[in-house]
Amino acid sequence: MAKAKIAVNGYGTIGKRVADAVRAQDDMEVVGISKTKPNYEAAVAHRLGYDIYAPAANLEAFEKAGMPAAGSIEEMLEKADLVVDCTPGGIGEKNKPIYEKVGIKAIWQGGESHPIAGFSFNAESNYEQAVGRDLTRVVSCNTTALCRAISTIDRELGVNKVRASLSRRAVDPNEIKKGPVDAIVLNPVKLPSHHGPDVRSVLPHINITTAAIKVPTTLMHVHTVNMEVNKDCTAEDVKNIFGSQSRIRLVGQGITSTAEIIEFARDIGRPRHDMWELCIWPESITVTDKELYFFHAVHQESIVVPENVDAIRAMMELESDGAKSIEKTNKAIGLYNK
C-alpha cells in the first residue's frame, strides 16, 4: 500500500511535532511543511530535510535566507492527500476555502471551533467514527486530557457526572510576548469554561462542567477532576483502570510537580522533553460513595501529537481499528508507558 502523503501547514509548537511523528510512521510521509517567514524554525526544518513551502509573496525572502522554498503553499497542497493545519487559532478557518478548492482532506487543531469540521476527534473515544472522513478537528490539549480520562473510566464504571477545575499554563515556553508573569488570571471569568462543551463534542452523553484559570508557568496544565460513577469501585480499581491505558501514565516515585514530570521526560530521552501521555498522580486518586477525585497534568505542547497521527490513519482508511492505530503510533514515536 502506498504511503499517505501528508502536508503540515504551520510549523510551530504543534506542527513541528506532528511532522516528526508522521515521518516516524511507515504508512504515511510528509510531503512538505509551511512557514510564512524564514525564521529559526524554518532553518531547523530545512536542516532536518523537510521541503519548505511558503506564501508565494515570501518565496524570495526564503531564497535570500539560504533556505530556498520548494514552492507555494498551494503547490504543497496539490502534492498531498491530507493536510494537517497547525496554524494559530483562527487562521485555520481562513484556510478552509483553500483546502476545499484543492479538494484535500483536512485536520484542524483545537484552536478552531467544532463547526469547522463538524466532527471532533479523540482516538480513545471515537476513532471509528473518523474512518474515511474528509474533515476532522483534533480537540485541544485540555480537552484531549479530559476525554482520555473520562472515556477510560466511562467504559469500565460508567460516568454520571464530571466536574473539573483547570489550572492552565500561561503560555508555551517560546512565547515571550505573552503572560501573565506575576498573576493568576480567571480564564474565563464567567463560568463555566468552554472545556465542558468541547468534551461533549467528542463524548456527547457526558454531563460535565469546567472552570479554568491561567497560572504563571509554561510547563504543563494541571486539572483537579471529580467524577461521579455508576458502579462501586475502590481507589485501587481506578488505578488499575488508568494503568491499563498506554496513553495514561501514573506518575509516582516522589513526583509532586509539573517540573519533575518534565525533568523525567528529559531523563528518559523524550524529544523536546515531550510527554504524550496524560499524567495522573495515583496517590491523589480518592473514592467516596461512587465519587472519585484525582489530579492530572497535561503537557500542552505534545499530548495532541499522537492524536493527529491516529486521525490521519482513520481518515485515510489505513486502519479501521482504533486500538491497532494507537499501538502502531505509539510504537513508531517511542511511547512506551511502562
Curated annotation (Swiss-Prot):
Subcellular location: Cytoplasm
Cellular component per GO, a single term: cytoplasm
InterPro entries, sorted: DapB_N, GlycerAld/Erythrose_P_DH, GlycerAld_3-P_DH_AS, GlycerAld_3-P_DH_cat, GlycerAld_3-P_DH_NAD(P)-bd, Glyceraldehyde-3-P_DH_2_arc, NAD(P)-bd_dom_sf
Residues the record lists as binding D-glyceraldehyde 3-phosphate: 140-142, 195-196
Reaction equation(s) it catalyzes: D-glyceraldehyde 3-phosphate + phosphate + NADP(+) = (2R)-3-phospho-glyceroyl phosphate + NADPH + H(+); D-glyceraldehyde 3-phosphate + phosphate + NAD(+) = (2R)-3-phospho-glyceroyl phosphate + NADH + H(+)
Keywords: Cytoplasm, Glycolysis, NAD, NADP, Oxidoreductase
Pathway membership, UniProt: Carbohydrate degradation; glycolysis; pyruvate from D-glyceraldehyde 3-phosphate: step 1/5
TM stretches of this protein: none
GO biological process, one term: lysine biosynthetic process via diaminopimelate
Domain of life: Archaea
GO terms of molecular function: 4-hydroxy-tetrahydrodipicolinate reductase; glyceraldehyde-3-phosphate dehydrogenase (NAD+) (phosphorylating) activity; glyceraldehyde-3-phosphate dehydrogenase (NADP+) (phosphorylating) activity; NAD binding; NADP binding
Family: Belongs to the glyceraldehyde-3-phosphate dehydrogenase family.
Protein name: Glyceraldehyde-3-phosphate dehydrogenase 2
Organism: Methanosarcina barkeri (strain Fusaro / DSM 804)
Encoding gene (name): gap2
